[in-house]
Design a protein with these regions (language model features):
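Conserved HGGG/HGGXW glycine-rich cap/lid loop of the alpha/beta-hydrolase fold
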Residues: 16-74
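Active-site loop/oxyanion-hole signature of alpha/beta-hydrolase fold enzymes
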Residues: 53-57, 63-102
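Conserved hydrolase catalytic core segment
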Residues: 101-139
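Helix-rich cap/lid subdomain of alpha/beta-hydrolase
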Residues: 130-192
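Active-site nucleophile elbow and catalytic-triad environment of alpha/beta-hydrolase enzymes
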Residues: 185-200, 215-217
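Short beta-strand/loop motif that positions the catalytic acidic residue
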Residues: 204, 210-212
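Conserved alpha/beta-hydrolase "acid-adjacent" motif
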Residues: 217-223
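Catalytic active-site module of serine/aspartate enzymes centered on a nucleophile-bearing elbow/loop
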Residues: 232, 237-259
Length: 259
């Protein structure tokens, strides 16, 4: 069972409040920073599946922010306040506020894009783990929009009556948002500002692990991504975009790689 949780917050570079959770004691290794995916928050992505427990069991200190527009962090409805580049700047402020000279960084899906951007621009990342992304990072820029077109996600999050939606990947985002009580206007703002540019993957100096579910439509051909990062290893897991996190090897591989 997780113990030692401390909730903290800070005003980011544009005065949006970012809330983060902190567990564990300072060690000789850098803290592990966990960045969650779209719609969910730190609890849903990292606490509930046991990732935080696994890291604490290995003696690590863990920091897990709720991204802007998600969880307990600030939720402006202006699309100009969003995008993974802005979230990467939030990570930089988190390190400045906590005084951490170096971190191990783990990101999933949207959080993987944030983490790749951050690691490509910063030298404060010792080791990097990204999951739930694949060739789309290079071929689309950011999260792969070929499997689930972005406009369908915006529509699914915007309609008043979700029963009018058919079964689709976009509908699953609406179901998840409603289950978590998420601010759908904030999520639409983020979806409207999704990162679409090139990421300087060859500038990533951290040793990197790419994790992908075999049946994840958002992480097709992950070898294309791992081969574009100078010092990267690819590990395949069972399951789709959500199911891969439940694979016991997901948590185990993160702990082992960051040791």
């Amino acid at each position: 069972m997780i113990t030692g949780l401390v909730m903290k917050s800070f005003k980011s570079w544009d005065q949006i409040e970012i809330v983060y959770q902190e567990w564990g004691e300072q060690t000789d290794l850098p803290p592990v920073v966990l960045h969650h995916g779209f719609v969910v928050d730190a609890n849903a992505n990292w606490v509930a599946p046991g990732i935080v427990d696994a890291l604490l069991g290995a003696g690590r200190r863990v920091l897990a922010p709720d991204a802007r527009g998600h969880g307990q962090s600030g939720k402006p409805h202006d699309p100009d306040s969003y995008g993974e580049q802005r979230m990467a700047r939030d990570l930089a402020v988190l390190l400045d506020v906590t005084g951490e000279p170096q971190i191990d960084l783990v990101g999933y899906s949207m959080g993987a894009i944030v983490s790749l951007i951050f690691a490509s621009e910063e030298e404060r990342v010792r080791r990097l783990v990204v999951g739930g992304v694949g060739s789309g990072v290079i071929e689309c820029g950011g999260v792969d929009r070929r499997a689930i077109p972005n406009d369908t996600i915006i529509e699914a999050l915007s309609v008043d009556d979700p029963t009018t939606l058919g079964k689709s990947g976009a509908t699953s985002f609406r179901v998840l948002a409603d289950a978590l009580g998420a601010d759908r206007e904030a999520l639409v703002a983020q979806a409207s500002s999704i990162y679409r540019g090139e990421i300087g993957l060859n500038g990533i100096s951290a040793r990197t692990l790419v994790l992908a579910g075999e049946d994840d439509p958002l992480a097709i051909r992950p070898n294309v991504l791992s081969e574009a990062i100078p010092d990267a290893t690819l590990m395949m897991l069972t399951g789709d975009h959500i199911g891969a996190i439940a694979d016991p090897d997901f948590a185990r591989s993160i702990v082992d790689f960051l040791a």
